[in-house]
Amino acid sequence: MCIRDSDMTIPIGSRVALVGRTGSGKTTLAHLILGLFRPTDGVLTLDGVPLTDIEMPAWQANCALVPQDIQLLDASLRENVAFGCDSEDIDDSQVWAALEASQFNDVVVSMPYGLFTMIGENGVELSGGQRQRLSLARAFYRDAKVLVLDEATSALDSKTEHDVMQALDLVGRRCTTIVIAHRLSTVRKCDRIFEVENGRIKAVGDFE
């Protein structure tokens, strides 16, 4: 989906939502913000300063994406949460904090090997909801400044989704959060909602 004639401002520390039909351009717009796609026209700015190719890696290092289609390692829970870190460099207290924020710590405590439980190829030993909570924990471990949740709670039941979004109230305001969702309950606490249609921002408002 091509994004056209669109301009948006996202204040630091805010939580915004991108809503619209499947294929409307929500994910493409989020990928442009993350620098995963480069605009052929227009610019991505930070505090009014355009981000250049030289600055883009530093920007991306401060961003985290929790997609709907999660890719997990055939490794331990601990290694999956601290994805990209050497085993000896993993901070277990930070791992537990990330698991608590994603409402997954109680499940891990109940597992025979705890953090060292192997999850199988792409998390085959976990349920869909558990895989998504683990992916959220990975983002929380990175302490990202910009967090994009692309239908990240779609496989969670209503109570768990509520718990995860409540956890975002505690940790999310330390970063800027962009939520892509279909459920109205998911975007209820967003400061600003952008409706995307056919690659354009059709309307901007809040939940009320």
Please identify what each model-predicted range represents.
Residues 4-208:
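ABC-type nucleotide-binding domain
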